């Protein structure tokens, strides 16, 4: 059988053709555009993720700072069954001269014992402080407290002797309680004096932030703890209560005063702390991630005298 051959006319088939230079250029340009879009999308997502992570970290730092401030406020003035808001300086039997007035039980008041204080300069070397610091003091159980931080108290008196108190008999002697008075034994507490200060400022040319300073075993400020970065201002306001109704004053309510002025003669019922970063603080170089104000509200134990909440 004869095969039929396909006759292709001359000039009718030139073979397979490749891409032209123009087509290569167009394809390459499209590839570059796609690559730029992918890279841009990646870096945008990375930037947003970094900003979100940094914002989350700062919010967590602020929440931790709020927890510490609220706890210190609730503990302020408490030394066992002795509460500073119920006593005057006459109930402080003995106190050695402190390295800083802020470490004294009497504070600046000439009558009432005030468990919180303000200070424009806490006196920590190298620290540039902005506005006033907020200071709390109280006692925590510690039988091995150093001589500089030992505090002994009963329900009616307190002493910071400047030495360790190893026995109950020594504690009763400091508090001028007769050794034969056994009924007072359960009221006597041997504690460590805690003084915590919160201040906004900076060290050298470093960034400003909120720092916490604590009284150490040597009776000095210990190493500061950075609680939150980028904080530039701490505004503290106080809540004072007055006009407590008597039992026969039916329908009468106590009066609350909300003020930014600290009264060194009256224990406030509460404090409000506003932490602010200012309008020029940015997160992860993103102009739309300004750190806004953070408000902390805390009550002071024994401050609301109308409620008689001293325990």
Where are the predicted features?
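Residue-level detector of short, conserved catalytic/binding motifs and their immediate flanks
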Residues: 19-22, 132-134, 196-198, 208, ...
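Aliphatic-rich helix starts adjacent to a transmembrane/signal segment
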Residues: 3, 15-78
């Amino acid at each position: 059988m004869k095969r039929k051959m396909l006759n292709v006319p001359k000039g009718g088939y030139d073979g397979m053709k490749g891409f032209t230079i123009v087509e290569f250029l167009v394809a390459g340009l499209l590839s570059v555009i796609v690559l730029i879009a992918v890279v841009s999308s990646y870096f945008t997502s990375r930037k947003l993720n970094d900003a979100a992570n940094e914002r989350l970290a700062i919010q967590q730092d602020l929440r931790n700072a709020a927890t510490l401030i609220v706890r210190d406020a609730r503990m302020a003035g408490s030394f066992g069954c002795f509460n500073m808001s119920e006593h005057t300086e006459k109930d402080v039997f003995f106190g050695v001269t402190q390295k800083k007035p802020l470490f004294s039980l009497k504070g600046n008041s000439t009558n009432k014992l005030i468990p919180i204080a303000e200070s424009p300069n806490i006196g920590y070397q190298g620290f540039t402080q902005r506005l006033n610091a907020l200071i709390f003091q109280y006692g925590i159980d510690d039988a091995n407290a150093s001589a500089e931080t030992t505090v002994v108290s009963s329900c009616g008196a307190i002493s910071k002797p400047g030495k360790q108190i190893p026995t109950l008999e020594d504690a009763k002697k400091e508090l001028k309680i007769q050794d034969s008075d056994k009924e007072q034994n359960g009221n006597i507490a041997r504690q460590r004096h805690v003084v915590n200060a919160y201040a906004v400022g900076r060290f050298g040319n470093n960034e400003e932030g909120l720092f916490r300073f604590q009284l150490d075993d040597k009776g000095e400020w210990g190493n500061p703890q950075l609680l939150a970065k980028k904080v530039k201002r701490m505004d503290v306001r106080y809540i004072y209560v007055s006009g407590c109704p008597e039992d026969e004053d039916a329908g009468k309510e106590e009066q609350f005063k909300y003020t930014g002025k600290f009264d060194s003669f009256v224990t406030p019922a509460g404090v409000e702390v506003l932490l602010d970063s200012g309008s020029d603080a940015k997160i992860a170089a993103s102009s739309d991630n300004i750190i806004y104000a953070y408000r902390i509200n805390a009550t002071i134990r024994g401050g609301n005298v109308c409620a008689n909440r001293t325990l």
